[in-house]
Amino acid sequence: MLSASRKLNNQQFLKTIRNMTTFRSEFDTFGEVKVNDEKYWGAQTQRSLENFDIGGESEKMPLMVVRSFGILKRCAAIVNKKYGLDATIADNIAKAATEVVEGKLDDQFPLVVFQTGSGTQSNMNANEVISNRAIELMTGKRDFSKKLVHPNDHVNKSQSSNDTFPTCMHIAAAISINEKLVPALEMLLAAMRTKQNEFNHIIKIGRTHLQDATPLTLGQEFSGYCTQIEYGIQRIKDTLPRLYNLAQGGTAVGTGLNTPVGFDVDIASEVAKFTGLPFKTAPNKFEALAAHDAMVEVSGALNTVAVSLMKIANDIRFLGSGPRCGLGELILPENEPGSSIMPGKVNPTQCEAMTMVCAQVMGNNTTVSIAGSNGHFELNVFKPVIIKNVLSSIRLIADASVSFTKHCVVGIKADEKRIDQLLHESLMLVTALNPYIGYDKAAKAAKKAHKEKTTLKEACLSLGFTTSEEFDKWVDPSKMIGSMK
């Protein structure tokens, strides 16, 4: 009932707004469409808005894709000018497109991800907005006649949605990785390195199979986390060469129909110049339109990073469990109250947030994998959902890494007293006796100590396996940590 009531209220609200708003008539090949007079978009955007009412605000096309369309249309205007497009038209298209890049026209891009799988409506959204804004820049007034600047003939000149959308996918992902993700992971890595060095002298008990194992230093444990993050950064960077290949110039099916020779090379060069990233034309446009293996590869690398961060965050929160009845080897920063019923309780919230992010990224990767596998013949038609999920994963990992660094990692402290207590209570120190009394006797001593709840030393002395001096000499945790840093 509540849902139905809200829906009715929304409908009444929209009806009221319509009554207050003036509309103009726009026309496309399907006929007349009414468009809000305050909007720059045209008939095709309006049809998409009405035909794909799916998901609402939360499912709108990511702004990075919108901004990437601005980059692409600006660069296309510059290149088309070289190939004969009227200079005044080209220059004003470029100016309008630059406003898209700068975010000045964000409210003119209302479409959701769940539309045509080629992203055609979003491409036309960009074409319509840029053409109408370009006319306004030329004349000083709004004119929706399309006579001075046409969305298809001018803004979309030498282009197809089938090559513009995948090009924008690559631009958006590459910029996001370079400007947001890599710096965030490098920040996390630096903080982890600091902790590794800080903890290098602290000898603790290791754990395998969730059971006590032989000693290592806390710094060595953190060095493993550092290497996971370092490899993750490298994996992400290793995907970039394929992302820098742009589909633009393939037009409808990859043949380059209706584009001048050299257009593909020139526009990739212009995009590279504008972004400062080494974009180049894709060597095979058929692959660039029909498959999105490069995006699947990126998503796979993001998934691997999520797997690493899940392990790291879980280890840290388990090592910080307590404060009285857990492992308690790490003291985590206390950022906020943890319970509405248990006074004084504090939880490892940054670790929990990170692990939830990792779970989401793993889910995103499943979506991208399925979508990437659905390239049929000359075109993959899952493009919008692929880029939505890739950008979501990039943003989530980047934001979570910064948050985890600032509010958790930099403030982690070691409880050296607790660590030393657990170290000397561990029966796995018996491993150091193997070379002196043999595996079988060492195992017998460990089992006796565990069963009788005595120390390992007491068990060895009781069994006559070692003297007190021999035990102290042979069972020295500082000699059991190896030379690995």
UniProtKB/Swiss-Prot annotation:
<dbReference type="InterPro" id="IPR008948">
    <property type="entry name" value="L-Aspartase-like"/>
</dbReference>
<dbReference type="InterPro" id="IPR020557">
    <property type="entry name" value="Fumarate_lyase_CS"/>
</dbReference>
<keyword id="KW-0816">Tricarboxylic acid cycle</keyword>
<keyword id="KW-0963">Cytoplasm</keyword>
<dbReference type="Pfam" id="PF10415">
    <property type="entry name" value="FumaraseC_C"/>
</dbReference>
<dbReference type="GO" id="GO:0005737">
    <property type="term" value="C:cytoplasm"/>
</dbReference>
<dbReference type="GO" id="GO:0006108">
    <property type="term" value="P:malate metabolic process"/>
</dbReference>
<feature type="binding site">
    <location>
        <begin position="345"/>
        <end position="347"/>
    </location>
    <ligand>
        <name>substrate</name>
    </ligand>
</feature>
<feature type="binding site">
    <location>
        <begin position="118"/>
        <end position="120"/>
    </location>
    <ligand>
        <name>substrate</name>
    </ligand>
</feature>
<comment type="similarity">
    <text>Belongs to the class-II fumarase/aspartase family. Fumarase subfamily.</text>
</comment>
<feature type="binding site">
    <location>
        <begin position="160"/>
        <end position="162"/>
    </location>
    <ligand>
        <name>substrate</name>
    </ligand>
</feature>
<protein>
    <recommendedName>
        <fullName>Fumarate hydratase, mitochondrial</fullName>
        <ecNumber>4.2.1.2</ecNumber>
    </recommendedName>
</protein>
<comment type="pathway">
    <text>Carbohydrate metabolism; tricarboxylic acid cycle; (S)-malate from fumarate: step 1/1.</text>
</comment>
<dbReference type="InterPro" id="IPR005677">
    <property type="entry name" value="Fum_hydII"/>
</dbReference>
<dbReference type="InterPro" id="IPR000362">
    <property type="entry name" value="Fumarate_lyase_fam"/>
</dbReference>
<dbReference type="GO" id="GO:0045335">
    <property type="term" value="C:phagocytic vesicle"/>
</dbReference>
<keyword id="KW-0496">Mitochondrion</keyword>
<feature type="binding site" description="in site B">
    <location>
        <begin position="150"/>
        <end position="153"/>
    </location>
    <ligand>
        <name>substrate</name>
    </ligand>
</feature>
<dbReference type="GO" id="GO:0006106">
    <property type="term" value="P:fumarate metabolic process"/>
</dbReference>
<feature type="binding site">
    <location>
        <position position="340"/>
    </location>
    <ligand>
        <name>substrate</name>
    </ligand>
</feature>
<comment type="function">
    <text>Catalyzes the reversible stereospecific interconversion of fumarate to L-malate.</text>
</comment>
<feature type="active site">
    <location>
        <position position="339"/>
    </location>
</feature>
<comment type="subunit">
    <text>Homotetramer.</text>
</comment>
<feature type="site" description="Important for catalytic activity">
    <location>
        <position position="352"/>
    </location>
</feature>
<dbReference type="InterPro" id="IPR022761">
    <property type="entry name" value="Fumarate_lyase_N"/>
</dbReference>
<dbReference type="GO" id="GO:0004333">
    <property type="term" value="F:fumarate hydratase activity"/>
</dbReference>
<feature type="binding site">
    <location>
        <position position="208"/>
    </location>
    <ligand>
        <name>substrate</name>
    </ligand>
</feature>
<dbReference type="GO" id="GO:0006099">
    <property type="term" value="P:tricarboxylic acid cycle"/>
</dbReference>
<feature type="transit peptide" description="Mitochondrion">
    <location>
        <begin position="1"/>
        <end position="19"/>
    </location>
</feature>
<dbReference type="GO" id="GO:0005739">
    <property type="term" value="C:mitochondrion"/>
</dbReference>
<keyword id="KW-0809">Transit peptide</keyword>
<dbReference type="Pfam" id="PF00206">
    <property type="entry name" value="Lyase_1"/>
</dbReference>
<dbReference type="InterPro" id="IPR018951">
    <property type="entry name" value="Fumarase_C_C"/>
</dbReference>
<feature type="active site" description="Proton donor/acceptor">
    <location>
        <position position="209"/>
    </location>
</feature>
<dbReference type="InterPro" id="IPR024083">
    <property type="entry name" value="Fumarase/histidase_N"/>
</dbReference>
<dbReference type="GO" id="GO:0009617">
    <property type="term" value="P:response to bacterium"/>
</dbReference>
<keyword id="KW-0456">Lyase</keyword>
